[in-house]
Regions:
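Positively charged, Gly/Ser-enriched RNA/tRNA-binding surfaces
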Residues: 2, 22-37, 48-49, 84-95, ...
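Acidic, His- and aromatic-enriched active-site or binding-groove loops in soluble protein domains
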Residues: 64-72, 177-203
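Short, basic, helix/turn surface patches
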Residues: 67-78, 187-192, 284-286, 366-371
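Cap/lid and interdomain-hinge subdomains that line or gate substrate/regulatory clefts
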Residues: 131, 135, 139, 162, ...
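Short internal beta-strands
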Residues: 160-164, 325-326
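Beta-rich nucleic-acid/ligand-interaction surfaces
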Residues: 46-62, 164-172, 259-268, 352
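Hydrophobic mid-domain F-helix/FG-region of cytochrome P450s
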Residues: 146-153, 167-177
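TRNA-binding/sensing appendages of the translation machinery
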Residues: 1-80, 85, 141
Length: 371
């Protein structure tokens, strides 16, 4: 007889009770929040043709795909590492004629080729919303506000929104602080590390003020305004300031203008969501462009949440009373109690024990009695 194995590939795990049910409840709560704001749910497939999927991807994301050859079509398929580009494909094709702004929500598993340092999972749940057709201040404010509300609905407190300007170095290097493509990459790396000495060694002293323009929103924004002496960034800064003003009573606000992690395709603004009691980010979002069928680009804003840490921490886990139904119980009474919200477990033999089966009550006639 072959020995049974419970070994799973590195970065994958089973979700067991009560975490699986808690995860479903949290997912439902977040999606209900998005639906209450008019975001209609779509559900793209886990697998797509590699060339179709990568055609909408940028940066290092293309190297994070799990690929295999379809034995039927002999074409290379890929497992999605992110749902956002799939939403873009749907918006540009199946829903290209739908009225704009188009509000869509989604939830599904994504798979990574490699695990991260903070989260070793290679498969994780991604829930999000995309507002397609505009990246105005009003649209961005709605997206950030809805993201905060969704996290609050999931049970998080002490939420912080950290704003960033993903394409800031691109804008500056093409204007008042010129850099070659290679130099720009080096400057981004030094800014990521907040390494003032490294910037000086590169001869990029003009970028040094960006390291100081980080922290509580009002102070950091004031430093960015001082840095922007020629008003090249004025419209972007005004936009981010307006978004912040619209949500200032809903979350703590910070600004890190050069933060790039997780912002491979966002442009003029991005944001990261943090919560009290958790080390890593709860989600990210921002503005971006979607390629259309006719070769143009369509503006959009959106966010993605990764609720795995919340589920692991027991969020949305709500212990419920469980009613044991003995052999020969009153089926009408049991049905009526289930309609009231009771969870029942029916005995299948005389040896079934209520406590062993995790029950908190047993049915005595027509009434539940605590064990």
């Amino acid at each position: 007889m072959q020995k049974l194995s419970n070994l799973l590939p590195e970065g994958f795990h089973d979700s067991l009770p009560p975490h699986a049910e808690a995860g479903s409840r949290l997912e439902r709560d977040v999606l209900d929040t998005l639906a209450s704001h008019g975001y209609a749910r779509v559900s793209p497939p886990l697998v797509e043709y590699e060339d179709v999927l990568t055609g909408r991807m940028t940066g290092s994301a293309k190297s994070d795909l799990m690929r295999f050859v379809d034995p039927i079509s002999q074409r290379t398929l890929a497992l999605r590492p992110d749902v956002t580009m799939q939403i873009g494909r749907i918006a540009a094709t199946s829903l290209s004629e739908a009225a704009r702004p188009l509000r869509l929500s989604y939830s599904g598993q994504v798979l990574k080729l490699r695990s991260g340092q903070l989260r070793p999972e290679r498969s994780r749940l991604q829930i999000g919303a995309e507002l397609i057709g505009t990246d105005s201040v009003a649209a961005a404010s709605e997206i950030v506000s809805v993201a905060i509300e969704a996290l609050s609905r999931a049970g998080l407190t002490g939420i912080t929104v950290d704003f960033t300007m993903p394409d800031l170095v691109d804008v500056l290097s093409a204007g008042p602080l010129p850099l070659s493509a290679a130099q720009a990459a080096e400057v981004r790396s030094e800014l990521d590390m907040k390494d003032a000495g490294g910037l000086t060694d590169l001869g990029a002293v003009g970028y040094l003020p960006l390291i100081e323009a980080t922290g509580p929103f009002d102070d950091a924004m004031a430093k960015m305004r001082s840095f922007d002496s020629d008003n090249l960034l004025a419209s972007r800064l005004d936009g981010i300031a307006a978004i912040a003003a619209n949500i200032k009573d809903k979350a703590n606000l910070t600004l890190d203008p050069t933060e790039r992690h997780g912002f491979e395709y966002q442009n003029w603004f991005g944001f990261t969501l943090f919560a009290e009691g958790f080390v890593g980010a709860m989600g990210r979002g921002g503005s971006y462009e979607i390629p259309t069928a006719d070769g143009d680009m369509e503006n959009a804003v959106g966010f993605s949440l990764y609720p795995g840490p919340l589920i692991d921490a027991g969020f949305s886990a709500k212990p419920k009373d469980v009613l044991f139904l003995p052999l020969g119980h009153d089926e009408e009474a049991a049905s009526s109690l289930r309609a009231e919200g009771w969870r029942t477990v029916a005995a299948l033999s005389d040896s079934d024990d209520a406590k062993t089966l995790g029950c908190t009550h047993h049915l005595d006639g027509e009434k539940p009695v605590a064990i």
